[in-house]
A protein has these predicted regions:
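Amphipathic alpha-helical polymerization modules
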Residues: 1-278
Length: 278
């Protein structure tokens, strides 16, 4: 009886967390460069129940022999195993702003361990040291003329330097070269991660490595191709229709577990109030 209560409770907790993840995805459906989170639910390891006892052997000396009888497997519930970002490219949105730049995915090698494709990101200077990474190319110029993102983090060049321009009248070519009046100023920095699932997702569409080390440059990486498009932004890759369906499914699963919990509660109430009187 109580084992069933614990199993139902794990199901409700898992579905609640899944609902929170889907809701956050839907809230960021219009956030540039946002990567939708995907959750994985799995069951806890099953337990094998066995009955242990003694049996009398009908002989003259009445020998008691122990026995073990397998009853069967019991599931102990489910849990939300992990949450991973979906790094598929979002659709392009034209903004006609020179400071808006979109990364265009090309070909990436496949990670042998995970079986997933790699991913590329803009390089940003993190104020706490090291680098942060993003797909949100909604950049601006600070008062000093440095190219920064919405958080005020400096956008880095391929050499790891801050990019400064006199005004927003600059041109970004398809290979990432930043030019002012036909004079090359810098090349936008892009980093490559062979297994982006290992990156830590932070607020405002930022990513960092687990140990704080910097990712390798995507330029001159074997098997890596990509491009840039100025006056465009990469939109969120959230599928609103699918997210709504998944949200309803998670809600129904939570509701079903809730009804089972109510049935257990009624059975316990009868056991205490009715059977106890006898």
């Amino acid at each position: 009886m109580f084992k069933g209560l614990y199993t139902v409770a794990t199901g409700m907790i898992a579905q609640q967390r899944k609902t929170e993840i889907i809701t956050n995805n839907m809230a960021n459906a219009n956030t540039p460069g946002f990567k939708a989170d995907q959750s994985t639910i799995r069951s806890f390891p099953d337990m094998l129940l066995s009955a242990v006892g003694n049996t009398n052997i009908p002989v003259d000396k009445k020998i008691n022999a122990p026995f073990i009888q397998e009853i069967g497997a019991v599931n102990t519930g489910i849990y939300l195993q992990e949450t991973l970002a979906n790094h598929a490219q979002g659709s392009l949105i034209e903004t006609n702003k020179t400071t808006d730049i979109a990364l265009i995915d090309g070909l990436f090698p496949i990670d042998e361990e995970s079986g997933n494709s790699g991913a590329i990101f803009f390089r940003l200077e993190h104020p706490d040291g090291g680098e942060a990474y993003t797909r949100n190319g909604n950049f601006t110029l600070d008062p000093e003329g440095y190219l920064v993102n919405g958080n005020g983090y400096y956008v880095l060049s391929d050499t790891g330097e801050r990019i400064i321009v006199p005004n927003d009248n600059f041109v970004v070519s398809g290979d990432g070269t930043v030019s002012v009046d036909d004079v090359e100023v810098a090349t936008l920095g892009v980093s490559f991660s062979l297994n982006p699932a290992l990156l830590v997702k932070q607020d405002n569409g930022l990513f960092q490595t687990v140990d704080g080390t910097n990712l390798a440059s995507a330029f001159n990486q074997e098997g890596v191709t990509f491009g840039f498009k100025q006056n465009f932004l990469e939109g969120s890759n959230v599928d609103s229709a699918k997210s709504m369906t998944d949200l309803l499914t998670a809600y129904r699963a939570f509701e079903a577990n809730q009804k089972v919990l109510q049935a257990y509660d009624k059975s316990m109430e009868k056991a205490v109030n009715e059977i106890g009187r006898v």
